[in-house]
Amino acid sequence: MRVLVPPAERSQDTRVGAPAWREAAQAMARTAHILTDRCGQEAVTMWQPKDSVLDPNVAHHLGRAAYIQPWRFRVEMIKGGGTLEKPPPGEGVTLWKGKMKPPAWYARLPLPLHRKARALQTTEVVHAHARGARLTAARLGRAQHQINGRVRQLLRQREVTDHRLSEVRKGLLINQQSVKLRGYRPKSEKVPDKADSMLTWEKEELKSMKRKMERDMEKSEVLLKTLASCRDTLNFCFKERLQAVDLMNQPLDKVLEQARRHSWVNLSRAPTPRTQGQKTPPPDPVGTYNPACALALNEAKRLLVESKDTLVEMAKNEVDVREQQLQISDRVCASLAQKASETLELKERLNMTLGLMRGTILRCTKYNQELYTTHGLIKGPLSKVHLETAEKLDRPLVRMYQRHVGTQLPEAARLAQGTDKLQCHITYLEKNLDELLATHKNLSWGLNCKNIGHEVDGNVVRLRLRQRQPHVCYEQAQRLVKDWDPRTPPPRSKSSADP
């Protein structure tokens, strides 16, 4: 049975030990308890994230509920009145059964796998550097490929422009030959006309087109040299990037596709609908995308835009020059053909006039001969022995009548007057006949000049139409400009001179 001690007796200290000794033991226990709580709290705090430390002024269950609230799934309304639960965005482990997604946990102390984690991190950095180097090399290779394509396009356009320039130069040679051929016309046909003005105008226009084509050739040559220099720079950077990594068994185009890229121009451009492109990293002197690569790619982009504009301009100028040259040639040929038709019309008129004058000359010549015959008949024979009795001026009848005073007959005077009058008319007729012959000669010379002029203009038109054909090259047209008369055959070669 339990014995109850009275209060007076309970207050009495029955312990044997000294109070100081007991206080020292209790102080040591309290110190150990405080140290145990502090070390345990610090150990737990070291393993917890920084944001997981709860406020000591808030109840533990309330603080924990507020802490894990962002981890819970979010309920969203969908069309039709239903709901859809989605995990919160960000990194972490999705717990579908508990409908929570805790964030990634980062320890503040090294874990037991710290060495392996650091090795994996180093490997990841090295692989990232290799991927970046391969991506930069792929971009450089793609840029070099596009620069090569643009160089080929520029070379083809230069061939077209050079062909057009040779056509313009051939047009200048044809113009020079046309002027030279027209210089062989007679002096009367060299009166300045619209055909000469058209030839002069054609020469000036062809010179202007020649200067335009030469400027395009010079500009394209400078651009071609710049593109070649940029290509060499891209090739050097490309090989330099490939020296930093070990090549994998995949083409560099696959590297761009793995990076979700379909172009090397700019990683910050608007992505395609299928992929989300990565942004171009800033140039890093010690990284994979160094300033030299950035400068080479920027120069390549600038040259691609500039060369595209230059190609469009050169193609447009070539088309304009071709059409303009054809129109000018057609207008000059039309003016020369019109001049030839006008010359033919004048030649026909001169030919008709010459025919009429030839008939008049024949009639005048015949009439002059008849007048000479009449003049001879009036004057009579040269010898008296040939005179008939009825024609003698001293025949018996006349002598018998003229014996009387004042009976002189006017027969001799009348014959002399008629002879003189007939002689004057013959002289006047011969003068007119000389004028007719001189005019006939001038008309014949003019008709011959018109024939030569018509033939020369026709030859010039045929020459121009024949030489402007595409199969006639510049060298063939250059052989036409020689210092020889086209009306004379060219000298034969020594091999064909002697059989």
Swiss-Prot record:
Sorted UniProt keywords: Cell projection, Cilium, Coiled coil, Cytoplasm, Cytoskeleton, Flagellum, Phosphoprotein
Q: What is its main location?
A: cytoplasm
Q: Enumerate the subcellular locations listed in this protein's record, separating them with semicolons.
A: Cytoplasm, Cytoskeleton, Flagellum axoneme
Entries under Pfam families matching the protein? Tektin
Q: Which domain of life is it from?
A: Eukaryota
Segments forming a coiled coil = 197-227, 297-317
Q: How does it assemble?
A: Microtubule inner protein component of sperm flagellar doublet microtubules.
Purpose of the protein: Microtubule inner protein (MIP) part of the dynein-decorated doublet microtubules (DMTs) in sperm flagellar axoneme, which is required for motile flagellum beating. Forms an extensive interaction network cross-linking the lumen of axonemal doublet microtubules.
Record protein name field: Tektin-like protein 1
Task: Tell me which species this is from.
Answer: Homo sapiens (Human)
